[in-house]
Amino acid sequence: MISEDLVETYQRDGVVCLRDAIPEKWLALGREGIDQNLKNPGRFFRDHTPTGASSRYVFEYWTWPQTPQFEDVIRNSPLGEIAGTLMQANHVHMVMDNWFMREAGASNGAPWHHDEPYFDFEGTLCIIWIPLERAPIEDGLTFVRGSHRWGQLYVAPEFSENVPFVCEGSQYQPVPDIDAHSEDYEFLSWEVDVGDCLVFDFRTLHCVTNRDQSAQQSQRRMTFRFGADDTVFSPRGRWTEETSAYLMGLGQKPGSPIDCDLMPKVWATA
Protein backbone atom coordinates (compact mmCIF):
# COMPACT_ATOMS: atom_id res chain seq x y z
CA MET A 1 0.00 0.00 0.00
CA ILE A 2 2.81 2.43 0.89
CA SER A 3 5.39 2.87 -1.88
CA GLU A 4 8.94 4.14 -1.41
CA ASP A 5 7.94 7.28 -3.31
CA LEU A 6 5.17 7.95 -0.79
CA VAL A 7 7.58 7.52 2.10
CA GLU A 8 10.00 9.98 0.47
CA THR A 9 7.18 12.45 -0.14
CA TYR A 10 6.01 12.19 3.46
CA GLN A 11 9.53 12.71 4.81
CA ARG A 12 10.07 15.72 2.50
CA ASP A 13 6.68 17.46 2.66
CA GLY A 14 5.45 16.42 6.11
CA VAL A 15 2.10 15.25 4.74
CA VAL A 16 0.66 12.80 2.19
CA CYS A 17 -2.81 11.93 0.96
CA LEU A 18 -3.57 8.21 0.70
CA ARG A 19 -6.41 7.28 -1.62
CA ASP A 20 -8.87 4.50 -0.80
CA ALA A 21 -6.70 3.39 2.10
CA ILE A 22 -9.33 2.85 4.81
CA PRO A 23 -11.93 0.08 4.24
CA GLU A 24 -15.56 0.96 4.94
CA LYS A 25 -15.65 -1.44 7.91
CA TRP A 26 -13.40 0.87 9.93
CA LEU A 27 -15.23 4.01 8.85
CA ALA A 28 -18.55 2.52 9.95
CA LEU A 29 -17.06 1.73 13.35
CA GLY A 30 -15.83 5.31 13.61
CA ARG A 31 -19.29 6.70 12.94
CA GLU A 32 -20.80 4.37 15.54
CA GLY A 33 -18.15 5.38 18.06
CA ILE A 34 -18.77 9.09 17.58
CA ASP A 35 -22.53 8.60 17.93
CA GLN A 36 -21.95 6.71 21.17
CA ASN A 37 -19.62 9.40 22.54
CA LEU A 38 -22.07 12.18 21.68
CA LYS A 39 -24.77 10.39 23.67
CA ASN A 40 -22.43 9.65 26.57
CA PRO A 41 -19.56 12.17 26.61
CA GLY A 42 -16.47 11.13 28.53
CA ARG A 43 -13.83 12.88 30.62
CA PHE A 44 -12.06 14.39 27.63
CA PHE A 45 -15.08 15.68 25.70
CA ARG A 46 -14.64 19.33 24.72
CA ASP A 47 -17.16 21.82 23.33
CA HIS A 48 -15.53 24.76 21.53
CA THR A 49 -18.77 26.17 20.19
CA PRO A 50 -18.71 29.98 20.49
CA THR A 51 -21.17 31.47 22.96
CA GLY A 52 -24.55 31.97 21.34
CA ALA A 53 -23.81 29.84 18.28
CA SER A 54 -26.37 27.22 17.33
CA SER A 55 -23.99 24.94 15.38
CA ARG A 56 -21.53 22.97 17.46
CA TYR A 57 -17.80 22.42 17.15
CA VAL A 58 -16.97 19.55 19.52
CA PHE A 59 -14.37 16.85 19.94
CA GLU A 60 -13.26 14.12 22.31
CA TYR A 61 -10.03 12.22 22.84
CA TRP A 62 -8.81 9.08 24.60
CA THR A 63 -12.22 7.53 24.13
CA TRP A 64 -11.18 4.02 23.10
CA PRO A 65 -11.15 2.40 26.58
CA GLN A 66 -14.90 3.14 26.82
CA THR A 67 -15.67 2.82 23.10
CA PRO A 68 -15.22 -0.70 21.68
CA GLN A 69 -15.59 0.56 18.13
CA PHE A 70 -12.48 2.72 18.41
CA GLU A 71 -10.54 -0.03 20.16
CA ASP A 72 -11.28 -2.32 17.22
CA VAL A 73 -10.03 0.31 14.77
CA ILE A 74 -6.87 0.91 16.79
CA ARG A 75 -5.91 -2.71 17.27
CA ASN A 76 -7.07 -4.32 14.03
CA SER A 77 -7.14 -1.77 11.20
CA PRO A 78 -4.17 -0.98 8.90
CA LEU A 79 -3.57 2.39 10.57
CA GLY A 80 -0.62 1.27 12.70
CA GLU A 81 1.15 -0.18 9.67
CA ILE A 82 0.49 2.97 7.64
CA ALA A 83 1.94 5.16 10.40
CA GLY A 84 4.94 2.93 11.02
CA THR A 85 5.82 2.63 7.35
CA LEU A 86 5.67 6.37 6.68
CA MET A 87 7.65 7.20 9.84
CA GLN A 88 10.16 4.43 9.00
CA ALA A 89 9.69 3.10 12.52
CA ASN A 90 10.50 -0.28 14.05
CA HIS A 91 7.29 -0.17 16.05
CA VAL A 92 4.51 2.30 16.83
CA HIS A 93 2.27 3.10 19.76
CA MET A 94 -1.15 4.66 19.36
CA VAL A 95 -0.75 7.65 21.66
CA MET A 96 -4.20 9.24 21.25
CA ASP A 97 -7.50 8.65 19.48
CA ASN A 98 -9.48 11.79 18.77
CA TRP A 99 -12.60 12.72 16.82
CA PHE A 100 -14.03 16.08 15.75
CA MET A 101 -17.48 17.20 14.68
CA ARG A 102 -18.17 20.56 13.05
CA GLU A 103 -21.88 20.99 12.40
CA ALA A 104 -23.31 22.71 9.34
CA GLY A 105 -23.29 26.43 10.05
CA ALA A 106 -20.38 26.31 12.51
CA SER A 107 -18.15 29.30 11.86
CA ASN A 108 -15.01 28.34 13.75
CA GLY A 109 -12.34 25.80 12.98
CA ALA A 110 -8.74 24.99 13.80
CA PRO A 111 -6.38 27.96 13.15
CA TRP A 112 -2.79 27.63 11.93
CA HIS A 113 -0.94 25.36 14.33
CA HIS A 114 1.08 22.20 14.61
CA ASP A 115 0.28 19.41 17.03
CA GLU A 116 3.44 18.91 19.04
CA PRO A 117 3.04 21.83 21.51
CA TYR A 118 -0.38 20.50 22.59
CA PHE A 119 0.95 17.12 23.67
CA ASP A 120 3.48 15.73 26.12
CA PHE A 121 5.53 13.75 23.61
CA GLU A 122 8.84 14.24 21.85
CA GLY A 123 10.28 12.17 19.03
CA THR A 124 8.86 10.96 15.75
CA LEU A 125 5.07 11.19 15.69
CA CYS A 126 2.34 11.44 13.08
CA ILE A 127 -1.39 11.97 12.79
CA ILE A 128 -3.76 10.03 10.55
CA TRP A 129 -6.77 12.22 9.69
CA ILE A 130 -9.80 10.37 8.34
CA PRO A 131 -12.93 12.06 6.95
CA LEU A 132 -16.15 10.17 7.56
CA GLU A 133 -17.88 12.07 4.76
CA ARG A 134 -16.52 13.33 1.47
CA ALA A 135 -14.61 16.56 2.00
CA PRO A 136 -14.04 19.06 -0.82
CA ILE A 137 -10.85 21.10 -0.53
CA GLU A 138 -12.57 23.93 1.33
CA ASP A 139 -13.84 21.53 4.02
CA GLY A 140 -10.48 19.85 4.54
CA LEU A 141 -7.07 20.88 5.84
CA THR A 142 -4.36 23.06 4.35
CA PHE A 143 -0.68 22.38 5.13
CA VAL A 144 2.51 24.39 4.83
CA ARG A 145 4.75 22.12 2.82
CA GLY A 146 7.97 21.13 4.58
CA SER A 147 7.23 23.12 7.76
CA HIS A 148 7.99 20.05 9.91
CA ARG A 149 11.66 20.50 8.95
CA TRP A 150 11.98 24.08 10.16
CA GLY A 151 13.25 23.01 13.58
CA GLN A 152 10.87 25.39 15.34
CA LEU A 153 8.08 24.96 17.89
CA TYR A 154 5.19 27.42 17.86
CA VAL A 155 2.90 28.59 20.65
CA ALA A 156 -0.27 26.51 20.68
CA PRO A 157 -3.43 28.54 19.90
CA GLU A 158 -6.62 27.56 21.72
CA PHE A 159 -9.13 26.49 19.08
CA SER A 160 -12.35 28.17 20.19
CA GLU A 161 -11.09 31.76 20.20
CA ASN A 162 -7.64 31.38 18.56
CA VAL A 163 -6.02 32.80 21.70
CA PRO A 164 -2.50 31.48 22.38
CA PHE A 165 -1.86 29.32 25.41
CA VAL A 166 0.85 30.57 27.75
CA CYS A 167 3.63 28.24 26.62
CA GLU A 168 6.65 28.61 28.88
CA GLY A 169 10.09 28.42 27.30
CA SER A 170 12.04 30.34 24.69
CA GLN A 171 11.69 27.46 22.22
CA TYR A 172 8.05 28.42 21.58
CA GLN A 173 7.65 31.22 19.06
CA PRO A 174 4.42 32.87 17.85
CA VAL A 175 2.85 31.17 14.86
CA PRO A 176 3.86 33.24 11.81
CA ASP A 177 1.17 35.27 10.07
CA ILE A 178 0.93 32.82 7.21
CA ASP A 179 -2.17 34.33 5.62
CA ALA A 180 -0.61 37.80 5.44
CA HIS A 181 2.53 36.45 3.76
CA SER A 182 1.14 33.58 1.73
CA GLU A 183 3.62 34.24 -1.06
CA ASP A 184 6.39 33.01 1.25
CA TYR A 185 4.94 29.50 1.61
CA GLU A 186 3.91 26.54 -0.48
CA PHE A 187 0.55 25.05 0.47
CA LEU A 188 -0.83 21.55 0.09
CA SER A 189 -4.48 20.54 0.28
CA TRP A 190 -6.66 17.83 -1.21
CA GLU A 191 -10.24 16.97 -1.93
CA VAL A 192 -10.75 13.74 -0.03
CA ASP A 193 -13.39 11.07 -0.41
CA VAL A 194 -14.64 8.44 2.00
CA GLY A 195 -11.83 5.90 2.38
CA ASP A 196 -9.05 8.45 1.84
CA CYS A 197 -6.88 9.76 4.65
CA LEU A 198 -4.22 12.38 5.29
CA VAL A 199 -1.09 11.49 7.23
CA PHE A 200 1.06 14.31 8.58
CA ASP A 201 3.99 14.94 10.88
CA PHE A 202 3.45 16.28 14.41
CA ARG A 203 5.32 19.46 13.42
CA THR A 204 3.63 20.21 10.10
CA LEU A 205 1.75 23.52 10.26
CA HIS A 206 -1.87 23.20 9.15
CA CYS A 207 -5.35 24.67 9.57
CA VAL A 208 -8.95 24.03 8.62
CA THR A 209 -9.16 25.46 5.11
CA ASN A 210 -12.50 27.29 5.52
CA ARG A 211 -12.02 28.08 9.20
CA ASP A 212 -13.30 31.65 8.71
CA GLN A 213 -16.45 30.55 6.89
CA SER A 214 -19.54 28.66 7.97
CA ALA A 215 -19.41 24.93 7.33
CA GLN A 216 -21.74 24.04 4.46
CA GLN A 217 -22.42 20.56 5.82
CA SER A 218 -21.74 18.71 9.04
CA GLN A 219 -18.25 17.25 9.17
CA ARG A 220 -17.03 14.30 11.20
CA ARG A 221 -13.35 13.43 11.34
CA MET A 222 -11.54 10.80 13.32
CA THR A 223 -7.82 11.11 13.95
CA PHE A 224 -5.22 8.86 15.50
CA ARG A 225 -1.82 9.96 16.74
CA PHE A 226 1.04 7.50 16.58
CA GLY A 227 4.52 7.57 18.10
CA ALA A 228 7.55 5.75 16.71
CA ASP A 229 10.09 3.84 18.78
CA ASP A 230 12.02 7.03 19.67
CA THR A 231 8.96 8.72 21.23
CA VAL A 232 9.26 9.69 24.90
CA PHE A 233 6.78 11.16 27.37
CA SER A 234 7.87 14.71 28.20
CA PRO A 235 5.41 16.91 30.15
CA ARG A 236 5.45 20.38 28.59
CA GLY A 237 4.06 22.70 31.22
CA ARG A 238 0.96 24.12 32.80
CA TRP A 239 -1.02 24.19 29.57
CA THR A 240 -0.82 20.38 29.26
CA GLU A 241 -0.84 19.48 32.95
CA GLU A 242 -4.28 17.84 32.85
CA THR A 243 -3.20 15.24 30.32
CA SER A 244 0.33 14.79 31.67
CA ALA A 245 -0.98 14.23 35.21
CA TYR A 246 -3.51 11.76 33.85
CA LEU A 247 -0.80 9.74 32.11
CA MET A 248 1.48 9.80 35.15
CA GLY A 249 -1.44 8.55 37.22
CA LEU A 250 -1.58 5.58 34.88
CA GLY A 251 2.10 4.84 35.46
CA GLN A 252 3.76 6.64 32.55
CA LYS A 253 7.16 7.97 33.67
CA PRO A 254 8.41 11.37 32.45
CA GLY A 255 11.45 11.20 30.19
CA SER A 256 10.79 7.55 29.39
CA PRO A 257 9.57 5.70 26.30
CA ILE A 258 5.86 5.08 26.06
CA ASP A 259 4.87 2.39 28.55
CA CYS A 260 1.21 2.78 29.44
CA ASP A 261 -1.88 0.69 28.73
CA LEU A 262 -3.68 3.78 27.42
CA MET A 263 -1.14 4.00 24.57
CA PRO A 264 -0.79 0.44 23.25
CA LYS A 265 1.80 -0.83 20.82
CA VAL A 266 -0.18 -1.54 17.65
CA TRP A 267 2.43 -2.44 15.03
CA ALA A 268 6.00 -3.66 14.71
CA THR A 269 8.25 -4.68 11.83
CA ALA A 270 8.80 -8.14 13.33
Question: What annotation goes with each model-predicted range?
Answer:
Residues 79, 89, 104-107, 133-137, ...:
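Short, charged/polar surface micro-motifs in flexible loops or helix N-caps
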Residues 109-117, 143-144, 205-208, 224-227:
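Histidine-centered catalytic micro-motifs
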Residues 112-114, 173-184, 213-218, 237-242:
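Short, surface-exposed loop/helix-turn segments at secondary-structure junctions
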Residues 44-49, 156-159, 194-199, 203-270:
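Non-heme Fe(II)/2-oxoglutarate
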Residues 113, 120-137, 191-194, 199, ...:
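Short, conserved beta-strand element in jelly-roll/cupin
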Residues 1-13, 19-112, 118-119:
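Non-heme Fe(II)-dependent double-stranded beta-helix
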Residues 137-207:
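Double-stranded beta-helix
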Residues 53, 119-122, 214-218:
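A generic structural micro-feature
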